[in-house]
From Swiss-Prot:
Annotated localization: Cytoplasm; Cytoplasm, Cytoskeleton; Nucleus matrix
Signal peptide range: none
Stated family: Belongs to the actin-binding proteins ADF family.
Main subcellular localisation: cytoplasm
Function statement: Controls reversibly actin polymerization and depolymerization in a pH-sensitive manner. It has the ability to bind G- and F-actin in a 1:1 ratio of cofilin to actin. Binding to F-actin is regulated by tropomyosin. It is the major component of intranuclear and cytoplasmic actin rods. Required for accumulation of actin at the cell division site via depolymerizing actin at the cell ends. In association with myosin II has a role in the assembly of the contractile ring via severing actin filaments. Involved in the maintenance of the contractile ring once formed.
Gene3D superfamilies, per the entry: Severin
Cellular component terms per the entry's GO annotation: actin cytoskeleton; cytoplasm; nuclear matrix
GO biological process: actin filament depolymerization; cell division
Organism: Kluyveromyces lactis (strain ATCC 8585 / CBS 2359 / DSM 70799 / NBRC 1267 / NRRL Y-1140 / WM37) (Yeast)
Keywords carried by this UniProt record: Actin-binding, Cell cycle, Cell division, Cytoplasm, Cytoskeleton, Nucleus
Record's protein name: Cofilin
Origin: domain of life: Eukaryota
Ranges of residues in domain ADF-H: 5-137
MF GO annotations: actin binding
Lineage: Eukaryota, Fungi, Dikarya, Ascomycota, Saccharomycotina
């Protein structure tokens, strides 16, 4: 339970485990239910294209997301995969929504074991592939 009193739905954890362990999904979008009492799965996808993921982020509302971020290492060292947690809170979102999402984030984030990086996005430049790659690779110590 978070500071805001919001709980994490079991389906949210199950979907995350399917992404992490079963590689069933490439990304998961999480949202608060209509009564703002529980964090639920809004959408799951096996779509590999990062731009398709970005297209799912609403311009005027908040959400959380988990993305199985794959990237190439330099010097032909192969690919790496890191699970990234996104808090999407655009400047144009309603203030109340931003407040509830900010105060509920920790409940979800603590429940998701195995996340390697956290990205806070208020506009699309902060969640662009290159921006995320820089943060993920820095966290992995490959730069």
């Amino acid at each position: 339970m978070s500071r805001s009193g919001v709980a994490v739905a079991d389906e949210s954890l199950n979907a995350f485990n399917d992404l992490k362990l079963g590689k069933k999904y490439k990304f998961i979008l999480y949202a608060l239910n209509d009564s703002k009492t529980e964090i639920i799965v809004k959408e799951t996808s096996a779509e590999q294209d990062y731009d398709k993921f970005l297209e799912q982020l609403p311009e005027n509302d908040c959400l959380y997301a988990v993305y199985d971020f794959e990237y190439e290492l330099g010097n032909n060292e192969g690919k790496r995969s890191k699970i990234v947690f996104f808090t999407w809170s655009p400047d144009t979102a309603p203030v109340r929504s931003k407040m509830v999402y900010a105060s509920s984030k920790d409940a979800l984030r603590r429940a998701l074991n195995g996340v390697s990086s956290d990205i806070q996005g208020t506009d699309f430049s902060e969640v662009a592939y290159e921006s995320v790659l820089e943060k993920v690779s820095r966290a992995a110590g490959s730069h």
